[in-house]
C-alpha cells in the first residue's frame, strides 16, 4: 500500500527536519506491523516544497491502493480541497484520504509538555492562550476550538485560542485581552507561522512566554506521538 504522508511544506530547515522525523517514525511504526501488508511511505506537500501532492499521487501505480494522510493538525482548505483534487486527478483506482491528525488528546498532552519546558506549572493557574494557524473554513475553526478544549483538560486551567492568520479571533488580540503568562503553540513545527506567533506575542508588549511547536528534530518522542496519531487516522 502506498501512503502519501502529506505536510504543508516550509522554508524552515528546523521545520523540515521535524517533519522528516515524523515520517521516519511513521515508517518505523508501519514496519512493525504483522498484517502482511507492505507499506511504502512517500513524501508530499501542499505548498512551498516538492513534490506537490498532485505530482506525487500522479506518479504512483494506478493499480495499487493508496491512502493520503495529511500531516496537518486540523481540517481545512488543504484537506478538503487540495487533497481531494489530487486524489481525483491521480487516476488511482483505490485511493482514500484520511482525516487530519487533530484534534487529539495526545497532541494536547504534547502541547502541555512544551508549555512545561517554557516554565509553565500547574500552580501557575492563570489563563493560557493557544495560537493556531487559522482556517477560512468553519470546520477547521471548530477543530481548533476543540483543540483548545482538550488543552484546557490537559492543563486543568482555562485556555483561550486565537489565530495567527488574519482570522478572528486573532492571536495577538486574545493575548492583549487576557494577558497570559504563557502561550501554547498549536503548530507542528518551526516555520512561518511559528515565527509570526512569537512576533505577534512580542508586539503586545506583554511578557507572555511562547512555547515551542509540538515537534522538533531533537525530540524523537514528540515525533513518535504525532506518528501514532498519523497511523490511527490512516486506519480509520
What are these regions (language model features)?
Residues 1-236:
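Active-site-proximal alpha-helix that buttresses catalytic centers in soluble enzyme cores
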Amino acid at each position: 500500500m502506498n501512503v502519501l504522508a502529506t505536510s504543508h511544506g516550509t522554508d524552515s530547515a528546523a521545520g523540515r527536519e521535524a517533519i522528516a522525523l515524523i515520517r521516519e517514525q511513521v515508517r518505523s511504526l508501519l514496519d512493525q506491523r504483522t498484517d502482511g501488508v507492505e507499506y511504502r511511505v512517500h513524501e508530499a506537500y501542499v505548498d512551498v516544497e516538492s513534490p506537490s501532492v498532485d505530482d506525487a499521487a500522479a506518479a504512483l501505480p494506478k493499480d495499487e491502493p493508496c491512502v493520503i494522510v495529511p500531516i496537518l493538525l486540523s481540517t481545512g482548505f488543504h484537506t478538503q480541497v487540495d487533497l481531494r483534487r489530487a486524489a481525483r486527478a491521480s487516476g488511482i483506482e483505490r485511493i482514500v484520504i484520511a482525516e487530519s491528525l487533530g484534534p487529539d488528546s495526545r497532541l494536547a498532552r504534547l502541547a502541555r509538555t512544551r508549555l512545561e519546558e517554557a516554565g509553565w506549572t500547574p500552580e501557575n493557574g492563570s489563563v493560557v492562550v493557544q495560537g493556531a494557524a487559522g482556517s477560512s473554513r468553519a470546520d477547521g475553526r471548530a477543530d481548533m476550538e476543540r483543540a483548545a478544549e482538550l488543552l484546557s483538560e490537559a492543563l486543568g486551567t482555562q485556555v483561550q485560542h486565537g489565530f495567527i492568520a488574519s482570522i478572528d479571533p486573532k492571536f495577538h488580540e486574545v493575548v492583549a485581552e487576557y494577558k497570559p503568562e504563557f502561550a501554547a503553540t498549536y503548530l507542528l513545527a518551526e516555520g512561518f507561522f511559528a515565527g509570526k506567533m512569537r512576533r505577534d506575542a512580542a508586539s503586545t508588549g506583554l511578557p507572555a512566554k511562547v512555547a515551542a511547536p509540538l515537534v522538533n528534530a531533537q525530540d524523537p518522542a514528540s515525533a513518535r506521538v504525532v506518528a501514532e496519531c498519523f497511523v490511527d487516522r490512516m486506519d480509520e
